[in-house]
């Protein structure tokens, strides 16, 4: 894994979109991770076929069933990953799984909001908690003293739509559950950056850009491959000063 240097990486929501793009990019690096754990809520369905094809091609890629809305599924996934790591820690956790709903302010209801928060905020919280022992182990094993993705890190994929300062932008005038839940994810990440700093775990947020995906639509400015490549480039350069940061795919600071 050129630049990152970690032994193991886990990506949630990896069966399509940005998650699948990150997995592809990790596997194509000149020095790829020893283990790439690609999580999917339903690994056996048709939309996960591309990921299954990669698993058959790359022996270092492990497909893990993980439903970010189920605490039982999350715990089972953590046990699966721990078994594969055979006593070693997990270097990098990328919380990418998320849902998007275009519902507007006048029509959003309780169920819309609950579903948005459950996947986009509570999911990353519970996933991070479940994999925390493995992240701590990786940080303890590392000879590095500072914070980095090659030592131990939690990266939460957020959005400019979660920026309170950018709330008036025309292109984000709807999707109330998504916007509110991503703003909450940003705060969660700040709390993680404070709470896990002494454990040697870097925590930060990254906005992947407007990407051509099922979620972002085909009007996006970036392809999945472009976004994934840029994101990994940013992650490879993170250090202590970036703990708690909110950056975009180019590494520029995002407004809160």
Question: Which residues fall in each region the model found?
Answer:
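Rossmann-fold scaffold of SDR-type NAD(P)-dependent oxidoreductases
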Residues: 12, 88-98, 120, 155-158, ...
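Canonical Rossmann dinucleotide-binding motif of NAD(H)/NADP(H)-dependent dehydrogenases/reductases
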Residues: 1-37
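Rossmann-fold cofactor-recognition segment
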Residues: 54-72
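Conserved Rossmann-fold cofactor-binding substructure of NAD(P)-dependent oxidoreductases
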Residues: 68-88
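C-terminal helical subdomain
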Residues: 198, 205-208, 213, 217-256
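Conserved mid-core alpha-helix of short-chain dehydrogenase/reductase
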Residues: 73-76, 123-130
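Conserved active-site helix of classical SDR/Rossmann-fold NAD(P)-dependent CH-OH oxidoreductases
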Residues: 20, 24, 122-125, 182-190, ...
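Catalytic loop of short-chain dehydrogenase/reductase
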Residues: 99-122, 132-197
């Amino acid at each position: 894994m050129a630049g990152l240097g970690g032994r193991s990486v886990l990506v949630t929501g990896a069966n399509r979109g940005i998650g699948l793009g990150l997995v592809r990019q990790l596997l194509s690096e000149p020095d790829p991770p020893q283990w790439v754990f690609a999580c999917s809520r339903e690994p056996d369905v048709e939309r996960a076929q591309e990921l299954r094809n990669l698993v058959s091609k790359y022996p270092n890629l492990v497909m893990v069933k993980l439903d970010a809305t189920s605490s039982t599924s999350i715990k089972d996934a953590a046990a699966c990953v721990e078994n594969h790591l055979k006593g070693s820690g997990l270097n990098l956790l990328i919380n990418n799984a998320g849902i998007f709903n275009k519902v507007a302010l006048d029509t959003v209801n309780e169920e819309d909001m609950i579903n948005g928060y459950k996947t986009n905020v509570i999911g990353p919280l519970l996933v991070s908690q479940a994999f925390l022992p493995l992240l701590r182990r990786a940080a303890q094993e590392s000879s590095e003293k500072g914070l980095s993705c090659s030592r131990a890190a939690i990266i939460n994929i957020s959005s400019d739509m979660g920026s309170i300062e950018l709330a008036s932008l025309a292109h984000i005038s709807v999707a109330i559950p998504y916007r509110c839940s991503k703003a909450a994810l940003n705060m969660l990440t700040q709390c993680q950056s404070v709470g896990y700093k002494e454990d040697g775990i870097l925590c930060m947020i990254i906005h992947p850009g407007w990407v051509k995906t099922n979620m972002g639509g085909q009007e996006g400015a970036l392809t999945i491959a472009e976004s994934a490549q840029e994101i990994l480039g940013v992650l490879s350069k993170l250090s202590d000063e970036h703990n708690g940061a909110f950056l975009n795919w180019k590494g520029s600071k995002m407004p809160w």
